[in-house]
Amino acid sequence: MKNGKQKNNILHISRTMDIGGAERIVYQLATDLKDEFDQVHVASTGGLWEEKLAENGIQHHRILDVDSKQPATVLKILASLSKIIKENEITLVHTHHRMAAFYIRLLQMRHPKLIHVYTAHNVFKDKLPLYKFALGKARTVAVSQAVQENILNDVRSKNSVVIYNGVKMKQSEHTVNEITKCDGIKIGCIARLSEQKGLPYLIQAMSLVTNPSVSLFLVGDGELKNDLINQTKELALEKRIHFLGYRSDVVECINSFDFCVLPSVFEGFGLVAIEAFMNGKTMIATDIPGVNEVVNSENGLLVPAEDPQALAQAIKQLAGDPEKRASLAA
């Protein structure tokens, strides 16, 4: 995409650059395609991927939370993004959040030649009143058919295509001693500790799995951490549920699990399922749009969302049947 006449500089806008599925995709796009552009920039509130971006020669710009609806914050974000676009001669903006798309739609009035690509990483139950306006001049990418249908229902966009996420993972046969030192069956859940991920239902399900040799390891952090820890204590599961926080050694964690679980209430795609499959692990997941495009009866088990009893039954099934785990993971 480089040319000898006009600069071709791209700016990715994400809410954060912490550990998460969308953030990982932003990092992969920024680094994998950097040779296709003269300059690659990323703007967000920051996070653990900042250091990796810097190592790859990609400049990160810290901005306020694009999800904020406070008028003063909105004005500051508009000013910040306009400055970044002007000073770095940005020609293409790739947004990864609905409000970020809204900001760029407004800024296109000041920068009319600006090209805008928007990737929808999730399905949304709520409707953003200005969503249709935000995508009015954008080329839109949906990460799954479920996300595509969500966009079509919300904004009637005719410029949307489905491109499934891919995963670029390091190869490793190592494990994590903190996990493998535990006896019995080890279940892994790699997720942001947020309402979307359905983790209270998973913890409730663990209380119904009475086998004391079955342990759950939660890899991730988020706003529900304290609530989930308290729920674990109330159910007297402290010895069987382990909170590992954010980890950079995700592959090694997956290698240490007997199988993985994704109890999401809603999801755009379910990138963690691909990660599990790539590392030879099967998956229990909720039967919801987006996830059920990845997980099926040939590679895992699907259960209804928000159903601890069904989730517990699936956990018992895989925990007690190593041959089933192996056949699904093959």
Language-model-detected regions and their locations in the chain:
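A conserved, positively charged/aromatic
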Residues: P112-Q145, D154-R156
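Short His-centered aromatic/hydrophobic patch
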Residues: T95-A101, A120
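A conserved nucleotide-sugar
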Residues: F37-Q39, L199-H242, L318-R325
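N-terminal strand-loop element at the rim of the active site
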Residues: H12-V74, E223-L224
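A conserved mid-protein helix/loop that constitutes part of the nucleotide-sugar donor-binding site
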Residues: G20-T31, I185, C189-L208, E223-I229, ...
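Conserved acidic donor-binding segment of nucleotide-sugar-dependent glycosyltransferases
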Residues: S297, L301-P308, K316-E323
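Short hydrophobic beta-strand element within catalytic cores of glycosyltransferases
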Residues: V42-A43, T282-A285
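Aromatic "clamp/platform" in nucleotide-sugar-dependent glycosyltransferases that forms part
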Residues: Y246, V265
